[in-house]
């Protein structure tokens, strides 16, 4: 018999750094999910990723207090800021540029994000990443 679904939730947790402190602990605890079990499983799954990279995670939890999680790749903005060597995007992206990235770097980011993007091919994924760069004030050369 299938488990009864209780709900889903989304968290953004740094890779390899899940711990019971806020915001992870309270978010899981109020839904009755075993916090330490989640932290151990999350840290084990993200140990091969870059430490501290923000990982969007979709947690599906069931009435018997069990859960499954799907860990996605870090946001395109994270990769773009890293490639452009900037701390944050522009406050007025249409008038101000904060950094530049090359087309090769955009392709590399698109290839890394391909499984999470709604694109059929690498060119479509590159257009999505280019849009993110434009909205952050990062110029592509």
Curated annotation (Swiss-Prot):
One Gene Ontology MF term: structural constituent of ribosome
Assigned GO CC terms: cytosolic large ribosomal subunit
Keyword annotations of the record: Methylation, Ribonucleoprotein, Ribosomal protein, RNA-binding, rRNA-binding
GO biological-process terms attached to the record: translation
Cross-referenced Pfam families: Ribosomal_L11, Ribosomal_L11_N
PTM section of the record: One or more lysine residues are methylated.
Function according to Swiss-Prot or TrEMBL: Forms part of the ribosomal stalk which helps the ribosome interact with GTP-bound translation factors.
Subunit and interaction comment: Part of the ribosomal stalk of the 50S ribosomal subunit. Interacts with L10 and the large rRNA to form the base of the stalk. L10 forms an elongated spine to which L12 dimers bind in a sequential fashion forming a multimeric L10(L12)X complex.
Family: Belongs to the universal ribosomal protein uL11 family.
Xref: NCBIfam families: L11_bact (TIGR01632)
PANTHER family on file: 60S RIBOSOMAL PROTEIN L12, LARGE RIBOSOMAL SUBUNIT PROTEIN UL11M
Name by which UniProt lists this protein: Large ribosomal subunit protein uL11
Organism from which the protein derives: Dinoroseobacter shibae (strain DSM 16493 / NCIMB 14021 / DFL 12)
């Amino acid at each position: 018999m299938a488990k009864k679904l209780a709900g889903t939730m989304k968290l953004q947790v740094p890779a390899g750094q899940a711990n019971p402190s806020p915001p992870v602990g309270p978010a899981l605890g109020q839904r009755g999910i075993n916090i330490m079990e989640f932290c151990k499983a999350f840290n084990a799954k993200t140990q091969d990723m870059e430490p501290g990279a923000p990982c969007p995670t979709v947690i599906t939890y069931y009435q018997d207090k069990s859960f499954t999680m799907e860990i996605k790749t870090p946001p395109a903005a994270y990769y773009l800021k890293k490639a452009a060597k900037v701390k944050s995007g522009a406050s007025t992206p249409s008038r101000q540029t904060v950094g530049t990235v090359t087309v090769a770097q955009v392709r590399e980011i698109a290839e890394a994000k391909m499984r999470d993007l709604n694109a059929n091919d690498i060119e479509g994924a590159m257009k999505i990443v280019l849009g993110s760069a434009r909205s952050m004030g990062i110029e592509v050369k």
